[in-house]
């Protein structure tokens, strides 16, 4: 199902689909959204504001060509080149914004509903955030 009106995310420059949630399948226990990026213009790349969740989130980035995304994890920014996976522990302020290219991100929130709060401040994560190779610090 198309997914619009996600808190802390601007309407453009991508297409979003809701793949799984407690609303679609009661008791699913996960919220899975597919984000499709296609050569996003520079003025629309910062579409996601820092936010946090009370549950862990996993972001999987994939492309058939090239996709580079800047990911904020707490106070650290990393540049992720697809294919890559990012673990975002509960309570960690985070945001993901396209730098260049085209591809998809599958956001898997380990909660059946999308719930987020403002990501200002350092957060209260109990675990370490992490990225898979390939990634490089900005």
Show where each model-derived region lies.
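Non-cytosolic beta-sheet module surface loops
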Residues: 50, 62-63, 98
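Conserved metal-binding segment of the jelly-roll/cupin
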Residues: 80-100
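Double-stranded beta-helix
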Residues: 1-2, 99-138
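A short beta-strand-loop-beta hairpin characteristic of the jelly-roll/cupin
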Residues: 58-82, 119-121
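Ordered hydrophobic segments in well-structured contexts
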Residues: 31-36, 58-61, 87, 106-109
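A short beta-loop-beta micro-motif enriched in histidine and acidic residues
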Residues: 43-59, 73-75
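A generic structural signal for short beta-strands and their flanking turns/coil linkers
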Residues: 30, 54-56, 67
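A short, N-terminal "cap"/entry segment at the start of jelly-roll beta-barrel domains
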Residues: 1-48, 135-138
């Amino acid at each position: 199902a198309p997914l619009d009106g996600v808190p802390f995310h601007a309407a453009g420059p991508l297409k979003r689909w809701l793949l799984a949630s407690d609303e679609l399948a009661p008791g699913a226990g996960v919220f899975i959204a597919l984000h499709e990026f296609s050569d996003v213009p520079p003025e629309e790349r910062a579409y996601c504001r820092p936010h946090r969740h009370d549950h862990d989130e996993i972001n999987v980035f994939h492309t058939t060509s090239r996709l580079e995304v800047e990911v904020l994890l707490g106070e650290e920014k990393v540049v992720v080149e697809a294919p890559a996976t990012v673990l975002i522990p509960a309570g960690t302020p985070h945001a993901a914004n396209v730098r260049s290219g085209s591809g998809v991100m599958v956001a898997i929130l380990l909660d059946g509903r999308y719930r987020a709060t403002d990501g200002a401040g350092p957060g209260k994560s109990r675990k370490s955030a992490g990225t898979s190779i390939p990634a490089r610090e900005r």
